[in-house]
Regions:
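Boundary/linker segments flanking structured domains
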Residues: 1-67, 71-209
Length: 209
């Protein structure tokens, strides 16, 4: 896949992130361009061996469009988020309190059925936020159907970002979601990214570390 057009979107020296009820932040554009320069495509036929347990960020592309962005900052890193959750058809939500009767109406009608330890019936839908968004939008069954859709319709790219605090990863995610506005991301509503040639006098560049 040719990425040149996407790689050059941050063609200014700096970017400003504006969010409701938050101070404006300024970042060097080169940092984000380096993220794209280091992206690797995940081999869907070898998911568990193809993705590390490091912290990082991942993108789901449909063609050249960024359709979903996520970060991984917990103990199992990208491996835990992508391999064990998003692309694991057995990663399902059986807790009724976490199932939305309206938004999850279709998946609930096609839910995976099983029994709990006491022999009571329970039903499960997608637990992965990424798969849940896809299932709701395209009316796909939980589990194998949403996993197959991800693999068959887009390319998942990722890069590791080590030696960084979780809050900085959150800012990276917020900036990229605000800029690309992926259709499957609903977080960071109201955030705006502005490209700048210079930082205003009196403002400092935030170092992501």
């Amino acid at each position: 896949m040719k990425m040149e057009r996407i790689l050059k979107v941050f063609d200014s020296n700096y970017v400003k992130l504006s969010r409701p009820r938050c101070p404006e932040l300024y970042f060097a554009s080169d940092y984000f361009n380096e993220i794209f320069d280091s992206l690797k495509s995940l081999d869907y036929s070898n998911v568990k061996q193809g993705i590390p347990r490091d912290k990082g960020i991942y993108f789901w592309f449909v063609g050249e469009q960024v359709n979903y962005i996520g970060i991984a900052k917990n103990r199992n890193g990208l491996y835990g988020r992508v391999a064990l959750q998003h692309l694991n058809e057995k990663y399902l939500e059986f807790r009724e309190s976490k199932q939305n009767p309206e938004l999850d109406k279709f998946q609930l009608s096609q839910a995976v059925q099983t029994l709990d330890a006491e022999g009571n019936a329970k039903i499960g839908i997608d637990k992965s936020t990424f798969r849940k968004k896809i299932g709701r939008k395209f009316k796909l069954k939980p589990g194998s159907e949403t996993v197959s859709y991800i693999k068959e319709n887009g390319t998942l790219k990722f890069t590791t970002i080590n030696n960084i605090e979780g809050k900085s990863l959150d800012l990276i995610e917020a900036t990229l979601i605000a800029f690309f506005q992926p259709p499957l991301n609903t977080a960071h509503t109201g955030a705006v990214v502005t490209k700048l040639s210079s930082v205003p006098v009196g403002q400092e560049v935030t170092v992501l570390k």
